[in-house]
């Protein structure tokens, strides 16, 4: 927007910047005058939902954020958790939803770039990435294009940067037709005594610009991300950033090299709202002012205005407060890596955010009110209405369970994601232990003979729509369960809360109750939230997405040689169900996709049972009793058995308990359950241990033959199951199987 800095501020201009009239009035009272055009843009960026969390902050404060291994919780670029031996894991999940819908390749690519910068800004070398993707209905005309662009963008950036993508999720629903979700997670490893923070310290110290040059790409991106879409979506294309993974790789190496010299006082990546957000956050956290001279900014386009420079979201850039005596060494390092290094300002003691451009002062604002004292709202909310219970006995049984299982395996939500993850380099760096497609990604920890880390991300949006509180609990529980199924002890989590317009009380109610559920589960499971992101206004023409509070977590494995996978079972192993037999069909994919029923409550999450069963499974893995483990979630027992058969290439002969109706036992999505493939010689020890710990076990059958054969219920060969499972995605994307 080419508007002069002294232009009159009109109601139209205020609305264009996403500010409410009362917010603008607050600005006038705060500064005692009309803001300049650049100042208006700065307030718009810092006070929007994306940067200030003004609608969610009250509720986010209720989440558990502390734990025995937590070094740094929310409030920094990423969370930091102790993993022993003087090392820590640094991790976070963030959304890039709106940009990825507008421009899928660059939106997804820069989402990866942004989350990687959050990690190495803290002094950690990125070692793993996962992503949680939600697309519209497969038959929507834009869906295939969006899937192709997003997956290519993620692969293009992460592969070139050199970080393995070790897992993730892909789901489809018509409620994402006009607003897809791209949630990106990254983790890095650092030394505990070498963590770097964004809090500026010291007066009169140099503020340094690092990395790539500034262009006009992404101007207004943070404000765009805090508004719902309408029919003018294509006009927002210039707000999408453009990424360069090779420059980011150089930036990583330069930053880590400089950090090793102990030259860095504070550092912040330029993400949402670019230079504005990074400088304001550094100053506000340190109770310092910041003065910038925009004439010192390296730019790649001519005649850029102060507004454009301050709000550009050009990628691969950092802001740093540097020890003055290290200036020459620091400059030499960044120039060696082909990056810009420019001293663009200084810290001050007056708590003002002052910006100079072409010899004139274009910004002079109170820095605290821009940063950590931005407006916070207690928005009205309506408690979600409870759904009627769908009893399994009231659901008519179908005639052919084998056909139903094949249909689910060949569906958009349950089919193999091989087409997706084979476009990612999952083994770069050489530490990945498990191929994507299982319960969790697992990597070895460098400089440690035995330790490994496990990663998972999870949420079931249809549960959250039916009951946000129970859905929030379930998202945490399934993430915790997936990590446990590898043998890892869950340590901590990060959240990415994706919802619609919080100004609608029913949407705000979804957010409130989901956070309550997440908080309860995290407390009970000792799984604190150490970082996260909130993405609101995920609506198009007033239609909201499904509430999608994604939870990603990290676990520690003491001996990576003991890791088990979904596909590790051996002939003769005994298949055991840990937990109760299936009985709950409400909100299951079986009733949704086979019977076209979308009613009922989601399954209740018994957190005591989750904790007890998860600890038991980790214990038997550590004792070496089992060859394989799998959590039971979407699709219930039948899908879990089929996936173990497909992943191992071996058959299972089993029988049902007949405690519940057959369709409920097969497809019920009751929580807190696992399948394990136990070594025959360990069965008696397993039973003794289960009795001691009061664990419910059901012996289902044995690993034998070349089919999944459930007595008097279904019999499907490994090849039939595999063909159904592997064929949907390539066919959808136009490739032969």
UniProtKB/Swiss-Prot annotation:
Mg(2+) 1 binds at residues 94, 533. Its main location: cytoplasm. Mg(2+) 2 binds at residues 118, 269. Pathway: Purine metabolism; IMP biosynthesis via de novo pathway; 5-amino-1-(5-phospho-D-ribosyl)imidazole from N(2)-formyl-N(1)-(5-phospho-D-ribosyl)glycinamide: step 1/2. It is found in: Cytoplasm. The active site is at 50, 96 (proton acceptor). Monomer. Part of the FGAM synthase complex composed of 1 PurL, 1 PurQ and 2 PurS subunits. Belongs to the FGAMS family. This is Phosphoribosylformylglycinamidine synthase subunit PurL. It comes from Bartonella bacilliformis (strain ATCC 35685 / KC583 / Herrer 020/F12,63). The gene is purL.
């Amino acid at each position: 927007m080419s508007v002069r800095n002294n232009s009159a501020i009109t109601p139209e201009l205020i609305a264009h910047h996403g500010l409410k009239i009362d917010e603008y009035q607050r600005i006038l009272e705060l500064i005692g005058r009309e803001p300049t055009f650049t100042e208006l843009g700065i307030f718009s960026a810092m006070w929007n939902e994306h940067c200030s969390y003004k609608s969610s902050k009250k509720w986010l404060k209720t989440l558990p954020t502390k734990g025995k291994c937590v070094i740094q919780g929310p409030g920094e670029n990423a969370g930091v958790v102790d993993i022993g031996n003087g090392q820590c894991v640094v991790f976070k999940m963030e959304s890039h939803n709106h940009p990825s819908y507008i421009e899928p390749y660059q939106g997804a690519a820069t989402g990866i770039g942004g989350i990687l910068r959050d990690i190495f800004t803290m002094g950690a070398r990125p070692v793993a990435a996962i992503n949680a993707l939600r697309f519209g209905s497969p038959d929507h005309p834009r869906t295939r294009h969006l899937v192709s662009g997003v997956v290519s963008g993620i692969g293009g950036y992460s592969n070139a940067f050199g970080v393995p993508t070790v897992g993730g999720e892909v789901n489809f629903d018509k409620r994402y037709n006009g607003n897809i979700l791209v949630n990106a997670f990254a983790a890095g490893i650092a030394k505990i005594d070498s963590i770097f923070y964004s809090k500026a310290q010291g007066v009169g110290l140099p503020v340094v610009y690092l990395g790539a040059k500034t262009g006009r790409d992404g101007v207004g991106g943070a404000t765009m991300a805090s508004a719902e879409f309408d029919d003018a979506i294509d006009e927002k294309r210039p707000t999408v950033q453009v990424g360069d993974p090779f420059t980011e790789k150089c930036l990583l190496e330069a930053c880590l090299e400089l950090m090793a010299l102990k030259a860095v006082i504070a550092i912040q990546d330029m993400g949402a709202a670019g230079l504005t957000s990074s400088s304001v956050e550094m100053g506000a956290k340190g109770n310092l002012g910041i003065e910038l001279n925009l004439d010192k900014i390296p730019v790649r386009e001519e005649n850029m205005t102060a507004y454009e420079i301050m709000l550009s979201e050009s990628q691969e850039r950092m802001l740093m407060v540097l020890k003055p005596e290290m200036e020459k060494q620091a400059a030499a390092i960044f120039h060696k890596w082909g990056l810009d290094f420019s001293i663009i300002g200084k810290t001050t003691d007056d708590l003002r955010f002052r910006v100079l451009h072409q010899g004139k002062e274009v910004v002079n604002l109170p820095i605290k009110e821009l940063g950590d004292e931005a407006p916070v709202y207690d928005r009205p909310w309506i408690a979600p209405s409870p759904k009627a219970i769908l009893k399994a006995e009231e659901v008519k049984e179908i005639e052919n369970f084998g056909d139903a299982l094949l249909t689910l395996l060949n569906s958009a939500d349950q089919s193999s994601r091989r087409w997706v993850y084979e476009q990612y380099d999952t083994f770069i760096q050489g530490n990945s232990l498990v191929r994507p497609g299982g319960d969790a990604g697992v990597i070895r920890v460098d400089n440690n003979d035995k330790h490994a880390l496990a990663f998972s991300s999870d949420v079931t949006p249809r549960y959250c729509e039916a009951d946000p509180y129970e859905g929030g609990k379930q998202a945490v529980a399934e993430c915790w369960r997936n990590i446990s199924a590898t043998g890892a002890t869950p340590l901590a989590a990060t959240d990415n809360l994706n919802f619609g317009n919080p100004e609608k009380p029913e949407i705000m109610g979804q957010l409130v109750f989901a956070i309550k559920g997440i908080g309860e589960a995290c407390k009970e499971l000792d799984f604190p939230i150490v970082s996260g992101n909130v993405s609101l206004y995920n609506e198009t023409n007033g239609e909201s997405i499904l509430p999608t509070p994604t939870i990603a977590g990290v676990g520690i494995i003491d001996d990576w040689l003991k890791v088990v996978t979904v596909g590790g079972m051996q002939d003769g192993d005994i298949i055991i169900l840990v937990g109760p037999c299936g009985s709950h069909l409400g909100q299951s994919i079986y009733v949704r996709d086979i019977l076209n029923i979308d009613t009922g409550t989601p399954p209740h999450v018994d957190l005591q049972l989750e904790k007890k069963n998860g600890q038991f499974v980790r214990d038997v893995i550590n004792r070496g009793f089992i060859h394989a483990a799998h959590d039971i979630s979407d699709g219930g027992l039948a899908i879990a058995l089929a996936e173990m058969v497909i992943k191992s290439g071996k058959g299972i002969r089993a029988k049902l308990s007949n405690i519940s109706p057959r369709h409920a036992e097969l497809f019920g999505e009751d929580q807190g359950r696992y399948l394990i493939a136990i070594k025959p010689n360990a069965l008696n020890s397993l039973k003794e241990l289960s009795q001691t710990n009061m664990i419910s076990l059901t012996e289902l059958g044995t690993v034998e033959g070349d089919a999944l054969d459930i007595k008097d219920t279904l019999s499907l060969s490994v090849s039939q199951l595999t063909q159904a499972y592997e064929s949907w995605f390539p066919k959808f994307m136009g490739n032969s199987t």
